[in-house]
């Protein structure tokens, strides 16, 4: 798998443009020089005045910025989109309209939303325009299977229908964000995650040594979601606070891929938040985890991802990461000495803490983990069909109070793995 910038935010604002024009002849009233002052307003309309440029600008309609909060309430501001967004209190989406998906897409959508809701990340709403963008990219990847999980549609391959070279292009072409960017007063954010859930008997990746337990071929979109859970960067993306989502899935032509069955299925998930909608968020004194209490059927093997968070790992198998997230702007830590992941009736597994301090991606790379994101990662494969108890101890700057000056937190919960051959 490969991933794109973890958060892409674009904004544009229209400015009032003033134009002074000279007029011939004399006359009373208005400008003593006969000048006409023009103003181009933020909404594209024009106003004129014979008094002054300020008077022309004052005739422009007042812009109103609106935002739809996570609780579905609407707030407005005459100042800016950011000011409108700031009026929303932190919150998550508890319920969405039933999707129109069928088959494996429906199962995967329901699974993702159920898991997000169970762990407190909030649900995503199906968006038909994002479906178009995601399906278009899945189809292009299926026509270009050896590009694995590229986020760029290269027209020079001559294969498949190019629906947008970059992710932003695909969202624009699908109508999710404006084209062109004229008088665009808001912001949008989006992430694209791509899963390749097929493995088959011809395992050809460096992570596949000793992975016979992956079984033969598993092509479901739901398995693609589960494999995205067993990652670091992609797990962050699939649990981000976006409002909408689109699913795409396609199977490559077997005559192209030959025996390399790991390239056969492409699953594209496009979470995003459109202009005028506010992303889901949590209060500063809150932490969320994934897995969380009661999550089942997680993949016992960390299968690697691109970019690779553990460059020195080589082909060594790791286990399902445990993700801890605080609110934006906070710093969250895990105390490795007092945190553990333990199988029922067994001993704690070896783990490592992954955070922004050890992330191999530089701070300038938008895909890197942030200070409010930290992982406890098993440095060995977890057992199939096994219940694990997770004990987490650490700190969260958003939880600092007089009674809790260090911002300490403690969490204990259980989750379980599945047997990969029974996906």
Located regions from the model:
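Bacterial N-terminal signal peptides that target proteins for export
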Residues: 2-12
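Bacterial Sec-dependent N-terminal signal peptides
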Residues: 12-43, 64, 74-76, 91-95
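Functional surface patches built around histidine and acidic residues
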Residues: 34, 64, 81-340, 369, ...
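A short, exposed loop/beta-hairpin motif centered on an aromatic-Gly-Thr core
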Residues: 44-51, 72-79
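A signal for long, low-complexity, Ser/Thr/Asn-enriched, surface-exposed stalk/shaft
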Residues: 52, 60, 78-81, 85
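Secreted, short cysteine-rich peptides and small extracellular cysteine-rich domains stabilized by multiple disulfide
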Residues: 56-59, 68
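Acidic, low-complexity Ser/Thr/Gly/Pro-rich repeat segments typical of extracellular/periplasmic
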Residues: 309-423
